[in-house]
From Swiss-Prot:
Transmembrane segments: none annotated. Its EC number is 6.1.1.19. GO terms for cellular component: cytoplasm. InterPro entries: aa-tRNA-synth_I_CS (IPR001412), Arg-tRNA-ligase (IPR001278), Arg-tRNA-synth_N (IPR005148), Arg-tRNA-synth_N_sf (IPR036695), ArgRS_core (IPR035684), DALR_anticod-bd (IPR008909), Rossmann-like_a/b/a_fold (IPR014729), tRNAsynth_Ia_anticodon-bd (IPR009080). Keywords: Aminoacyl-tRNA synthetase, ATP-binding, Cytoplasm, Ligase, Nucleotide-binding, Protein biosynthesis. Belongs to the class-I aminoacyl-tRNA synthetase family. This is Arginine--tRNA ligase. A motif ('HIGH' region) lies at residues 131-141. Its main location: cytoplasm. GO terms for biological process: arginyl-tRNA aminoacylation. PROSITE patterns: AA_TRNA_LIGASE_I (PS00178). It comes from Paracoccus denitrificans (strain Pd 1222). SMART domains: Arg_tRNA_synt_N (SM01016), DALR_1 (SM00836). SUPFAM superfamilies: Anticodon-binding domain of a subclass of class I aminoacyl-tRNA synthetases (SSF47323), Arginyl-tRNA synthetase (ArgRS), N-terminal 'additional' domain (SSF55190), Nucleotidylyl transferase (SSF52374).
C-alpha cells in the first residue's frame, strides 16, 4: 500500500472528471502532478500542486482550477477536507481511518511494505568500489562500498533487477608496480634485504604475498631478470590483492555479483570493437588537440592522436583514445568496458566514483550515450572524502597499510553496522566526518544509536505484551480495532509509517540511499517522542493493562514502525537491534 500514490490516483481521477465535464481541456499532461506532505503540517496531511502545474496549459487561473478540484475531492469519503491555499495550492486532510489502514497494511505486508514495482524489472548495473588491486581498501573505498551496496539494495526494493559489479583495474602500469613491490617482499622472504624504492608500495600487507611467492617458487625467481618473472608475479600478486579486497568487502557484508577484468579487454578485440562502433558513427578522427589551460592531463600530447568526438555528446573537449605511438589511452578500455555492459543488455548504468574522478564524468557519459545511441542512461555518483576523528582529534594512519587508514581499521573500531549506517548520514557528494568515539555514543545526536534504540523499544513492547498473554503476531495485530488510535501523536506516527513507500520511490529515482537513513531517524524520533509522552500521559503508553482493545491497537502501531525500521535498515545493510547493550 502506498497511500500517497493512492491519493494521487484520486486527484488524477478528479482531474479526468473535470475534463469530461468541460471544466478543463482534454489531453492535459498530468505527469508532473504531485501529492506530498505539506511543508507545514498545520496546513493538512497532504498537498497537491495540480492546479499550479495545469494552469498554463489549461489557460486558466490556478486558483480557479484548485477550487473546482477541491469540490470534487471533498466529496470523496477518504477526504475530510480540501482547502485552497495561496495562488492555487490544495491542502488535503484525510479521515483518520486512512492512517489506521496504513498500520494494518504494514502488518499485512510485513517486510514487503514499501516495496515497489516502480522499476518494472529494469536491469541496472551498479559498478562500485573498483579499487586498484594494489593494496587493502582504504576509508574512501569504505564509503563508496557502502553507498553502492545500499543503492543496489534500494533499487532492488523498488522493483529493479540489479547487478553489483566490480571493475578490476589490472591492465595498467600500477599492477606492474605491485609486481615489483611484491617481488621485493619475495626477496625478503628468502632472507635478502628488500629494496623498497620510491614509487613502490611500502605497506606490510605485501609481506604475506612475498612469503606465498617463496612457498610456490622457492628461490627460483631470484636470479631471473625482471622480464622473466614480472608477468607471473603480477598475476599472482593481483589475485592475492583481490582475495584481500573480497575479504575487506565481506567485513562490510558487501558481496559482488560480477568481477570484470580490464586486462581481459586487451588482446581480445573488445577495445577495437568499441572504438570501431564510434568510428562508424562518425565520432572518431585523427587530430591534434589544443593544449589545455592549466594543468596538462596525462593523455595530452602535441602530436596527432586518435580522438573521440565527445563534444558531440556534451563533453567540454574531444578525448584521445589512442596515442601517437599506437598505444591505447586510459580512456579506451573504459569505453570498451562500458560497451561490454551495454551489450550485456542493461537498461541503465550507474558508476560510483571517488570525487577525484569528477573530470571523468562528462567523457564517460558522452561515450555511453554515443555507444548506446542514447538508449542507455549513465548516472555517475561521486563519493566525497571521509575525514576520520577520535574524540575530535584526527585519527592516525594504519602502519599495516603504510600510508592510509584501511577499511579493516574502520570496521574493527566501529563495527560493520555502525560503519554502514554512518557512511549514509550525508549525501554522497558532501564530505563526511567519522568520529570513532561519537558514532558509538548513546545519544540522540548519534543517528545510528537513535534508530537502533527505536528498533529495540518496539521489540521490548512486543516481548512484554507477549509475556502478558497478548498475541503479538502480525496476523493477530492486524485484526485490532485501530479506531482506538485517535490521539494526534499516534496519528502523526501513523502518518510517518505512510510516508515510507513514498520515501523509497523518491530515494530510488534520485539514486540517493542517504534519504533512507534520514527517514529512519525521523520515524525513530516520532516513536521516541510518543514513548516519552507516555511517561506523563498514561493513555499514550503502548502497554495498556485492563484495556485489551486499546493495547492491541497501540502494539499494532509500534509493530508497524518496527516493520518500517527493519525494512529501512535492511536496505542500508544494517541488522535491526532487538535490544540495546
Amino acid at each position: 500500500m502506498n497511500l500517497f500514490s493512492d491519493i494521487r490516483t484520486l486527484v488524477i481521477g478528479a482531474l479526468a472528471q473535470m475534463e469530461q465535464a468541460g471544466e478543463l481541456p482534454a489531453g492535459l499532461d498530468t505527469a508532473n502532478v504531485t501529492v506530498e506532505p505539506p511543508r507545514d503540517a498545520a496546513h493538512g496531511d497532504m498537498a497537491t500542486n495540480a492546479a499550479m502545474v495545469l494552469a498554463k496549459p489549461a489557460g486558466k487561473k490556478p486558483r480557479d482550477i484548485a477550487e473546482a478540484l477541491a469540490a470534487r475531492l471533498a466529496a470523496d469519503p477518504r477526504i475530510a477536507s480540501a482547502e485552497v491555499a495561496g495562488p492555487g495550492f490544495l491542502n488535503l486532510r484525510l479521515v483518520s481511518g486512512e492512517w489506521q489502514s496504513v498500520v494494518r497494511a504494514a502488518l499485512a505486508e510485513g517486510g514487503d511494505y514499501g516495496r515497489s514495482e516502480m522499476g518494472r524489472g529494469q536491469r541496472i548495473n551498479v559498478e562500485f568500489v573498483s579499487a586498484n588491486p594494489t593494496g587493502p581498501m582504504h576509508v574512501g573505498h569504505t564509503r563508496g562500498a557502502v553507498f553502492g551496496d545500499a543503492l543496489a539494495a534500494l533499487l532492488d526494493f523498488s522493483g529493479h533487477e540489479v547487478t553489483r559489479e566490480y571493475y578490476i583495474n589490472d591492465g595498467g602500469a600500477q599492477v606492474d608496480v605491485l609486481a615489483r613491490s611484491a617481488y621485493e617482499r619475495y626477496r625478503e622472504a628468502n632472507g635478502l634485504e628488500p629494496e623498497i624504492r620510491e614509487g613502490l608500495y611500502p605497506g606490510d600487507y605485501l609481506i604475506p604475498v612475498g612469503e606465498a611467492l617463496k612457498t610456490k617458487y622457492g628461490e627460483t625467481l631470484l636470479d631471473k631478470p625482471e622480464e622473466e618473472w614480472l608477468a607471473e608475479v603480477r598475476d599472482f600478486a593481483t589475485r592475492a590483492m583481490m582475495d584481500m579486497i573480497r575479504e575487506d568487502l565481506a567485513l562490510l557484508n558487501v558481496h559482488m555479483d560480477v568481477f570484470s577484468s580490464e586486462k581481459a579487454l586487451y588482446g581480445t578485440g573488445r577495445i577495437e570493437a568499441a572504438i570501431e562502433r564510434l568510428r562508424q558513427a562518425g565520432l572518431i578522427y585523427e587530430g591534434v588537440l589544443e593544449p589545455p589551460k592549466g594543468k596538462t592531463p596525462e593523455d595530452w600530447e602535441p602530436r596527432e592522436q586518435t580522438l573521440f568526438r565527445s563534444t558531440a555528446h556534451g563533453d567540454d573537449v574531444d578525448r584521445p583514445v589512442k596515442k601517437s605511438d599506437g598505444s591505447w589511452t586510459y580512456f579506451a578500455p573504459d569505453i570498451a568496458y562500458h560497451w561490454d555492459k551495454i551489450e550485456r543488455g542493461y537498461d541503465a548504468l550507474i558508476d560510483v566514483f571517488g570525487a577525484d574522478h569528477g573530470g571523468y564524468v562528462k567523457r564517460m557519459t558522452a561515450a555511453v550515450k554515443a555507444l548506446s545511441d542514447g538508449r542507455v542512461p549513465l548516472d555517475v555518483k561521486l563519493i566525497q572524502l571521509v575525514r576520520l576523528f577520535k574524540n575530535g582529534e584526527p585519527f592516525k594512519m594504519s602502519k599495516r597499510a603504510g600510508t592510509f587508514v584501511t577499511l579493516r581499521d574502520v570496521v574493527e573500531q566501529a563495527g560493520a553496522d555502525v560503519t554502514r549506517f554512518h557512511m549514509l548520514t550525508r549525501k554522497n557528494d558532501a564530505a563526511l566526518d567519522f568520529d570513532f568515539a561519537r558514532v558509538l555514543e548513546q545519544s540522540k545526536d548519534n543517528p545510528v544509536w537513535y534508530v537502533q534504540y527505536a528498533s529495540a523499544r518496539v521489540n521490548s513492547v512486543l516481548n512484554k505484551a507477549a509475556g502478558m498473554g497478548v498475541d503479538t503476531t502480525d496476523a493477530a495485530l492486524a485484526q485490532a480495532d485501530l479506531a482506538q488510535l485517535s490521539h494526534p501523536a499516534e496519528l502523526e506516527l501513523a502518518r510517518k509509517v505512510a510516508e515510507w513507500p513514498r520515501t523509497v520511490e523518491i530515494a530510488a529515482r534520485a539514486h540517493e540511499p542517504h534519504r533512507i537513513a534520514f527517514f529512519l531517524y525521523d520515524i525513530a524520533s516520532e516513536l521516541h517522542s510518543l514513548w516519552n509522552r507516555g511517561n506523563d500521559e498514561p493513555a499514550l503508553r503502548f502497554l495498556q493493562e485492563g484495556d485489551p482493545a486499546a493495547m492491541a491497537a497501540k502494539i499494532a502501531l509500534a509493530r508497524s514502525v518496527g516493520v518500517v525500521i527493519s525494512a529501512g535498515l535492511g536496505i542500508l545493510g544494517v541488522t535491526p537491534a532487538k535490544e540495546m547493550r
